[in-house]
Amino acid sequence: MNLEVVAQLTALAFIVLSGPLVIALLAFRKGNL
């Protein structure tokens, strides 16, 4: 695998993982307030 493919997969994984994480964080903060 070359570096471009690895970088794209890393970026994609980051976006896919950060989506639900941000939603969970917002829900948690909203629940606290």
From Swiss-Prot:
InterPro entries linked: PSII_Ycf12_core-subunit
Name-wise, this protein is Photosystem II reaction center protein Psb30
Q: How does it assemble?
A: PSII is composed of 1 copy each of membrane proteins PsbA, PsbB, PsbC, PsbD, PsbE, PsbF, PsbH, PsbI, PsbJ, PsbK, PsbL, PsbM, PsbT, PsbX, PsbY, PsbZ, Psb30/Ycf12, peripheral proteins of the oxygen-evolving complex and a large number of cofactors. It forms dimeric complexes.
A family per Pfam: PSII_Ycf12
Organism equals Staurastrum punctulatum (Green alga)
Which Gene Ontology CC terms are recorded? chloroplast thylakoid membrane; photosystem II
Would you identify the family this protein belongs to, as annotated?
Belongs to the Psb30/Ycf12 family.
Q: Which GO terms describe its biological process?
A: photosynthesis
Q: Does the keyword Transmembrane helix apply?
A: yes
The protein's location, in the record's own words, is:
Plastid, Chloroplast thylakoid membrane
Any stretches that span the bilayer, and where are they?
A: 8-28
